[in-house]
């Protein structure tokens, strides 16, 4: 059985040796062997395997100069390690390197060789197989290049835990350690690259792109990751196509049609150079220009694509390049390559022939079967050296490698080459860790260490996973848990060299995966040259950018990147282009006209400085000065009768309340503050209640005094000055109590109202409780209504120049103002609410001030002759006569007595009319006294005295039905006209009614006189005689002051003039006694 296994292994090796001859591998012995997989050729010749004969190994074609340079980097690193005294001393590293021809099949053939040798060593069959030469196991493999190739190799090597360190396979699928257990790499995976691509598109504000990916394990995962990143950034993908170097012409044509018809100008390509080359050739043939190609690192510097004849199509490409490294001495090592000197490198012979287009085999004739290209994979490059079919000359061996420009000597940027160099050193440092391991500190069971002389592949894999060393550039090298080596990218831009017309790769930025999100990408836009040699960033959006002040609106049925620009609504703004939504302005701000920003809202209130506020302030100040002026006048003329008659103390309090009313209006002007809001309504309410309470007490007092028939002690007691102030206090205290409850439970406060108008903030007062405000105003209106009732009832009383009448007018004005205030207050808003209330307060205050005080001030200042006690008493007397006459004539049943001298016949009550007519000129210097016939009935209490004849001796005319008499009273003249119409006395007596009466009296400024007077009226008819006789005078109703104390300062004129006079009116055979109360 052992012999059988040995023979199978030998057969596998023999078959592999036939497939890979000496010229198709590089091999060198050593204590430890490293395997290598490099794409020395770009592909294999297509053959139709019809299986009619034994299948032959496929032939590799199209030489890859960069692939050979990567192989040289591995050899250089191994030789440098072998010569190092500090790294793996006393040990030699060997290598076995094979050409993968950039295909999975060739790579698996080479991998099978590594696995088979390791299997033979693990079986220890040398003694049975009788092998002539022992070949050590391959403890690690460097490679492969493409992700698709590495995926196939990793599946096979993973079965035997042989570590694989790739230098160019970046597919993120290879990070799956459950499937690829032994895979590691010195290149970042495509996850970071896909993120970087999305960041670049977002940076240039593109949102409409197309994607193309290689149909393998490199392109599909890479473009899938890009889609995820693009979706997070609202980047839309117009088309997504897969390509391959093996795609037929029809498939390529379809992809080109899609690209040509698409409106996307940016195309993201995750592919290698060989897979992309057929597509680019067709695009060049069709001359499709104006596209921006975003290249992954696999073809970002590929010479297959970066050809001068393609520049009008691919010029301006933005790509990712791996971080370039430095390998000291590597350039000289590359220049030393020679077929005769590189005995361990079977690929050197073909490299020499392809470089100098010659052949080393003497006598070789005939055309070469294939064209010779210079081409690279993933780092790329393609140059046609010779497509001629002529005979190649013999190589002399003296050719100079520096005389020919090939990608092999492109030493400017060592990216993949440096990754190869780093992969070799990673394996060497893992071996070094094994070599220097101390028992008890190892990575294996119980801290044991591996034997460096018998080291196995899985032990090397263990140490690679825990690797940590510093490279020649001073950077820390370590593999993460996924076996990846995190690195950065360079951003390159394709330019056309002005020197030789070739395409050069200019570094225009970088991508730092270690930086925090948002700061990873840096691009210098000034260095970028776009397609068509333009410096302006191309446009690749489904819709035009929405300018500031607008937002993107979704179009139904279209991708989210295809939108229409919608203007931001009022109150919202967008300060940047392509805003997905408009931002709402803060509460105190509003959008400007273009909706590009927010501006502070206009703050509006009834300000002191605005014309309306100034006008109201002036009116309020005017009211305050007028009130103060009136108060000053009253204080100065406090001892005059008209001031005394108004109850000085109560008038002072009333004027003070009016001052408060005018002043309270000022709290409604200016910016509302919490304290002004809490003060203005109570100040207004309390001031008006105080004012109305004073008026109410004055009005009610006058009414009660004039309605009283006989003054009693009740009036003197309850209408004293102290009680009047007490009533004012009680009425005002109720309002104060309402305000205290209001301020305690729900105090008003300033409020910034944003809802009334969009662009204006109205600073107003929030009243806190509408119920409390209603109670305050309601109580004020209730007192005003009561005051109006009493004032209206006493409007005809003569007290103090018809003060009750003016109070009635003032209350009427008060109600008109506040009734008008209610709809105006409800229909206004903002600052006009305060203005309406100020106007109402001022109007009501001016009405009260004018109606109650202006007439008195006018008399005091301009009519001092009327500011006398006599004037006051004369008005009282006139009122008394009118009351007496009306009371007599309206009495329904009159006691009729006839004088014995006139006979006992029953008289009838004539239809009479009494009128009074004032005549200031008709006066007599001295009244004439005549004996008149005594009245039929006299008041028994009055003193006996001779009646005063009030008219001169007149000639009687008995035939006249009407007589007129002039009655002289003091210095005034009163004319009474009494007419009688009694054609039938009996009929008139039965009618018992009066037809008409009138009385006109003129008051004079002379002394009214304080005496009893008999006022007889005699006509020609003896039966028609009417006599008015004052029968008594009673003293003041209130207080202890006597009527004679006229000059006393302490005496109230209103109280002095309050008297009760008793009159007997007789005539026509009847008499009536009437008590008249007048003031």
From Swiss-Prot:
Spermine binds at residues 238, 240. Residues 699-722 are annotated as: Intracellular loop 2 (ICL2). Keywords: Calcium, Cell membrane, Disulfide bond, G-protein coupled receptor, Glycoprotein, Membrane, Metal-binding, Phosphoprotein, Receptor, Signal, Transducer, Transmembrane, Transmembrane helix, Ubl conjugation. Residues 790-805 are annotated as: Intracellular loop 3 (ICL3). Residues 894-964 are annotated as: Disordered. Residues 919-931 have a biased composition (Basic and acidic residues). Residues 637-648 are annotated as: Intracellular loop 1 (ICL1). Residues 637-648, 699-722, 790-805, 855-1079 are cytoplasmic. It is a multi-pass membrane protein. Residues 855-1079 are annotated as: C-terminus. One of its GO terms (biological process) is cellular response to hypoxia. In kidney, expressed primarily in the thick ascending limb of the loop of Henle. Residues 22-188 are annotated as: Ligand-binding 1 (LB1). Disulfide bonds join 60-101, 236-561, 358-395, 437-449, 542-562, 546-565, 568-582, 585-598. It is found in: Cell membrane. Ca(2+) binds at residues 81, 84, 87-88, 100, 145, 170, 188, 190, 231, 234, 297, 489, 557. The keyword Protease does not apply. GO terms for cellular component: apical plasma membrane; axon; axon terminus; basolateral plasma membrane; cell surface; glutamatergic synapse; neuronal cell body; plasma membrane. InterPro entries: ANF_lig-bd_rcpt, GPCR_3, GPCR_3_9-Cys_dom, GPCR_3_9-Cys_sf, GPCR_3_C, GPCR_3_Ca_sens_rcpt-rel, GPCR_3_CS, Peripla_BP_I. The modification Phosphoserine is found at residues 899, 920, 1062. The modification Phosphothreonine is found at residue 888. Its main location: membrane. One of its GO terms (molecular function) is integrin binding. Belongs to the G-protein coupled receptor 3 family. The extracellular regions of the homodimer interact in a side-by-side fashion while facing opposite directions. Each extracellular region consists of three domains, LB1 (ligand-binding 1), LB2 and CR (cysteine-rich). The two lobe-shaped domains LB1 and LB2 form a venus flytrap module. In the inactive configuration, the venus flytrap modules of both protomers are in the open conformation associated with the resting state (open-open) and the interdomain cleft is empty. In addition, each protomer contains three anions, which reinforce the inactive conformation, and one calcium ion. G-protein recognition is mediated by the intracellular loop 2 (ICL2) and the C-terminus, which contribute differentially towards the binding of the 2 G-protein subtypes G(q)/G(11) and G(i)/G(o), resulting in distinct CASR-G-protein interfaces. The C-terminus confers selectivity for G(q)/G(11), while it contributes less to G(i)/G(o)-coupling. The C-terminus adopts opposing orientations for G(q)/G(11) and G(i)/G(o)-coupling. This is Extracellular calcium-sensing receptor.
């Amino acid at each position: 059985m052992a012999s059988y296994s040995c023979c199978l292994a030998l057969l596998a090796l023999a078959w592999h040796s036939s497939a890979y001859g000496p010229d198709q591998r590089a091999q060198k012995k050593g204590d430890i062997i490293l395997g290598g997989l490099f794409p020395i050729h770009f592909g294999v010749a297509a053959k139709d395997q019809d299986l009619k004969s034994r299948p032959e190994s496929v032939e590799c074609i199209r030489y890859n100069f960069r692939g050979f340079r990567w192989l040289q980097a591995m050899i250089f690193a191994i030789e440098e390690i072998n010569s190092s005294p500090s790294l793996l001393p006393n040990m030699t590293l060997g290598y076995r390197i094979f050409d993968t021809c950039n295909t999975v099949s060739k790579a698996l053939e080479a991998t099978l060789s590594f696995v088979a040798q390791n299997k033979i060593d693990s079986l220890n069959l040398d003694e049975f197989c009788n092998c002539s030469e022992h070949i050590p196991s391959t403890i690690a493999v460097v490679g492969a290049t493409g992700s698709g190739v590495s995926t196939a190799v990793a599946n096979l090597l993973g079965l035997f835990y042989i570590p694989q360190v790739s230098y160019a396979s970046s597919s993120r699928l290879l990070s799956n350690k459950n499937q690829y257990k032994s895979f590691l790499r010195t290149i970042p995976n495509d996850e970071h690259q896909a993120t970087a691509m999305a960041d670049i598109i977002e940076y240039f504000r593109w949102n409409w792109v197309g994607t193309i990916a290689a149909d393998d394990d490199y392109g599909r995962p890479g473009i899938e990751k890009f889609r995820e990143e693009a979706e997070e950034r609202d980047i839309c993908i117009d088309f997504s196509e897969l390509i391959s170097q093996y795609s037929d012409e029809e498939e390529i044509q379809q992809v080109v049609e899609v690209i040509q018809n698409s409106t996307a100008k940016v195309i993201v390509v995750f592919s290698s150079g060989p897979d992309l080359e057929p597509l680019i050739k067709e695009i060049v043939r069709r001359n499709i220009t104006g596209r921006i190609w975003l290249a992954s690192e696999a073809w970002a510097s590929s010479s297959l694509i970066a050809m001068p004849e393609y520049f009008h199509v691919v010029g301006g490409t933005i790509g990712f390049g791996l971080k370039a490294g430095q390998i000291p001495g590597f350039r000289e090592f590359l220049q030393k390559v020679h077929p005769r000197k590189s005995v361990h490198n079977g690929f050197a012979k073909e490299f020499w022939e392809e470089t100098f287009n010659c052949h080393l085999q003497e006598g070789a004739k005939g055309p070469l079967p294939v064209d010779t290209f210079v081409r690279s994979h993933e780092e790329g490059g393609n140059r046609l050296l010779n497509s001629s079919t002529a005979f190649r000359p013999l190589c002399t061996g003296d050719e100079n490698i520096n005389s020919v420009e090939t990608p092999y000597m492109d030493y400017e940027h060592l990216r993949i080459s440096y990754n190869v160099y780093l992969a070799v050193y990673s394996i060497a440092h893992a071996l070094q860790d094994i070599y220097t391991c101390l028992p008890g500190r190892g990575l294996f069971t119980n801290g044991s260490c591996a034997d460096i002389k018998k080291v196995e592949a899985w032990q090397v894999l263990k140490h690679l996973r825990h690797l940590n060393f510093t490279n020649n550039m001073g950077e820390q090298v370590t593999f993460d848990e996924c076996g990846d080596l995190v690195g950065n990218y360079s951003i390159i831009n394709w330019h056309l060299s002005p020197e030789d017309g070739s395409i050069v790769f200019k570094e225009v930025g970088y991508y730092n995966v270690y930086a925090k999100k948002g700061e990873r990408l840096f691009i210098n836009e000034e260095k970028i040259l776009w397609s068509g040699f333009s410096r302006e960033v191309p446009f690749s959006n489904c819709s035009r950018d929405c300018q500031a002040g607008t937002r993107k609106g979704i179009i139904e049925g279209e991708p989210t990147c295809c939108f229409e620009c919608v203007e931001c609504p009022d109150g919202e703004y967008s300060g940047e282009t392509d805003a997905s939504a408009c931002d709402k302005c803060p509460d105190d701000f509003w959008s400007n006209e273009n909706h590009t920003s927010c501006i502070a809202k206009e703050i509006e209130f009834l300000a002191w400085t605005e014309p309306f506020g100034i006008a109201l302030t002036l009116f309020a100040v005017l009211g305050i000065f007028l009130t103060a002026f009136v108060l000053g006048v009253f204080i100065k003329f406090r001892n005059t009768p008209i001031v005394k008659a108004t109850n000085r103390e109560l008038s002072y309090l009333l004027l003070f309340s009016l001052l408060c009313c005018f002043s309270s209006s000022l709290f409604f002007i200016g910016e509302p503050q919490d304290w002004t809001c809490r003060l203005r309504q109570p100040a207004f309410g309390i001031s008006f209640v105080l004012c109305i309470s004073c008026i109410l007490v004055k009005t009610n007092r006058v009414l009660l005094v004039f309605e009283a028939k006989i003054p009693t002690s009740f009036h003197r007691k309850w209408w004293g000055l102290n009680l009047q102030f007490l009533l004012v206090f009680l009425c005002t205290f109720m309002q104060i109590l309402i305000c205290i409850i209001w301020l305690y439970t729900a105090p008003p406060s300033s409020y910034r109202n944003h809802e009334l108008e969009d662009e204006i903030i109205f600073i107003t007062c929030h009243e806190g409780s509408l119920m409390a405000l209603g109670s305050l105003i309601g109580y004020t209106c209730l007192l005003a209504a009561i005051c109006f009732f009493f004032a209206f009832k006493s409007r005809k009383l003569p007290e103090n120049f018809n003060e009750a009448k003016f109070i009635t007018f003032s209350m009427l004005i008060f109600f008109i103002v506040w009734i008008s205030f209610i709809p105006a207050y409800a229909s206004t808003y903002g600052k006009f609410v305060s203005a309406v209330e100020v106007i109402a307060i001022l109007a009501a205050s001016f009405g009260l001030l004018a109606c109650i005080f202006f007439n008195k001030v006018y008399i005091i200042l301009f009519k001092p002759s009327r500011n006398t006690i006599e004037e006051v008493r004369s008005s009282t007397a006139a009122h008394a006569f009118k009351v007496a006459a009306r009371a007599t004539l309206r009495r329904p049943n009159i006691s009729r007595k006839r004088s014995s001298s006139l006979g006992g016949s029953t008289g009838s009550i004539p239809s009479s009319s009494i009128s009074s007519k004032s005549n200031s000129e008709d006066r007599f210097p001295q009244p004439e006294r005549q004996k008149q016939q005594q009245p039929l009935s006299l008041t028994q209490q009055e003193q006996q005295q001779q009646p005063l004849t009030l008219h001169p001796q007149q000639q009687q005319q008995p035939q006249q039905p009407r007589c007129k008499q002039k009655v002289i009273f003091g210095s005034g003249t009163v004319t009474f006209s009494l007419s009688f119409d009694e054609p039938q006395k009996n009929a008139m007596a039965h009618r018992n009614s009066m037809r008409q009466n009138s009385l006109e009296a003129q008051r004079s400024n002379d002394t009214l006189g304080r005496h009893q007077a008999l006022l007889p009226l005699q006509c020609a008819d003896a039966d028609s005689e009417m006599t008015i006789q004052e029968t008594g005078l009673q003293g003041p109703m209130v207080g202890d002051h006597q009527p004679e104390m006229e000059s006393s300062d302490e005496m109230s004129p209103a109280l002095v003039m309050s008297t009760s006079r008793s009159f007997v009116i007789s005539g026509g055979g009847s008499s009536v006694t009437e008590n008249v109360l007048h003031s």
